[in-house]
């Protein structure tokens, strides 16, 4: 009897986990479709043109058409590529982007479960994301892909340090590593008010972490053709694309959670904050030119890191004085 109950519980856990995973994947696909359409429409408006307007009403079905086009294309694997690692790399990148969403609060509870150390979980899992890109660059056996992978690894590691210090400052100020409790602590005053310099540093680091302009060095077309995914087509390229935009949406949501209160007021205002942060990413892409690689490294290690350390020390001092 005990064995049957355990088997029933196991089956329930598997079914529940599968359904929740499906919800996250479908939500991400819809979110990425919305983000790509929003990006193209906003950039078109900034450049005084119309943007996508052919497929569907005012171009609303354009992301669906692009997705179908990618999936229906032939998957071409280079002869000199390491085929197993070549296939694993985009799957790994997309899987990590899904796992990161498991602790993001979309209501009273998170998608999967309310983890007490949700912030630490995000920091730990996000640091693994670089492996998919490195594996893609190495397995493609192409100098452009390899250089793009190396650049991405160096860039993500460099800016993770500064971003980690800013998140530590938020944890210290809030006195918790639970995402839900961090939002609840901002009911009266958003953290952007006392931690405005930290917000600016976190935003710059988020741009670099997601390889967005002006820090899109791993995909620099003029230098590396397309970077680490230059040898990918069809589903492989689509998975990298989905993973990249899922991370952009995640960073937008995290910035709104850490500094703007997230969904502490209501879900609609929380969604508007996330969309506002996403529009900020798009605005930066449309206005700023790309950095040189040496300037990127200089900014990360000699400017952002010392400032992030000063902010962290300042937050610790402020908390000690208040207490």
From Swiss-Prot:
Location in the cell reads: Mitochondrion inner membrane
A biological process (GO) of this protein is: aerobic respiration
Keywords (alphabetical) are: Electron transport, Membrane, Mitochondrion, Mitochondrion inner membrane, NAD, Respiratory chain, Translocase, Transmembrane, Transmembrane helix, Transport, Ubiquinone
Top-level taxonomic group = Eukaryota
Q: What is its EC number?
A: 7.1.1.2
The membrane-topology field of this record reads: Multi-pass membrane protein
Show the catalytic activity.
Answer: a ubiquinone + NADH + 5 H(+)(in) = a ubiquinol + NAD(+) + 4 H(+)(out)
Residues spanning the membrane: 10-30, 52-72, 84-104, 119-139, 157-177, 189-209, 245-265, 268-288, 302-322
**The UniProt record lists the keyword ATP-binding:** no
Does the UniProt entry include the keyword Calcium?
A: no
GO MF, one annotated term? NADH dehydrogenase (ubiquinone) activity
What GO cellular component term, any one, is given? Answer: mitochondrial inner membrane
The free-text function statement in the UniProt record for this protein reads:
Core subunit of the mitochondrial membrane respiratory chain NADH dehydrogenase (Complex I) that is believed to belong to the minimal assembly required for catalysis. Complex I functions in the transfer of electrons from NADH to the respiratory chain. The immediate electron acceptor for the enzyme is believed to be ubiquinone.
Describe the family membership recorded for this protein in Swiss-Prot or TrEMBL. Answer: Belongs to the complex I subunit 1 family.
Record protein name field: NADH-ubiquinone oxidoreductase chain 1
Lineage of origin? Eukaryota, Amoebozoa, Evosea, Eumycetozoa, Dictyostelia
């Amino acid at each position: 009897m005990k064995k049957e109950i355990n088997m029933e519980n196991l089956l329930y856990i598997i079914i529940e986990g599968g359904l929740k995973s499906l919800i996250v994947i479908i939500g991400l696909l819809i979110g990425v479709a919305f983000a790509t359409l929003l990006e193209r429409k906003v950039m078109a408006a900034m450049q005084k043109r119309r943007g996508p307007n052919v497929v569907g009403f005012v171009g609303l079905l354009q992301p669906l058409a692009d997705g179908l086009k990618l999936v229906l294309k032939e998957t071409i694997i280079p002869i000199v590529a390491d085929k197993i690692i070549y296939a694993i790399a985009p799957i790994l990148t997309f899987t990590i982007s899904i796992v990161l969403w498991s602790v993001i609060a979309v209501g009273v509870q998170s998608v999967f479960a309310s983890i007490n150390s949700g912030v630490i979980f995000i920091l730990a899992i996000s640091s693994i994301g670089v492996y998919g890109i490195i594996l893609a660059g190495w397995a493609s056996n192409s100098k452009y892909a390899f250089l793009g992978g190396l650049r991405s690894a160096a860039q993500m590691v460099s800016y993770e340090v500064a971003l980690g210090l800013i998140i530590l400052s938020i944890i210290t100020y809030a006195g918790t590593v639970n995402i839900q409790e961090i939002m609840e602590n901002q009911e009266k005053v958003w953290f952007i008010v006392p931690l405005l310099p930290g917000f600016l540093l976190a935003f710059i680091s988020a741009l670099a972490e997601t390889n967005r302009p002006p820090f899109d060095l791993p995909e620099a077309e003029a230098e590396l053709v397309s970077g680490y995914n230059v040898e990918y087509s069809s589903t492989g390229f689509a998975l990298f694309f989905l993973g990249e935009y899922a991370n952009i949406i995640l960073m937008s949501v995290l910035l709104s959670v850490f500094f703007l209160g997230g969904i502490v007021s209501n879900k609609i205002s929380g969604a508007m904050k996330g969309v506002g942060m996403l529009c900020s990413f798009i605005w930066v892409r449309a206005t700023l030119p790309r950095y040189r690689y040496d300037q990127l490294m200089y900014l990360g290690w000699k400017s952002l890191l010392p400032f992030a350390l000063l902010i962290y020390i300042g937050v610790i001092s402020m908390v000690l004085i208040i207490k």
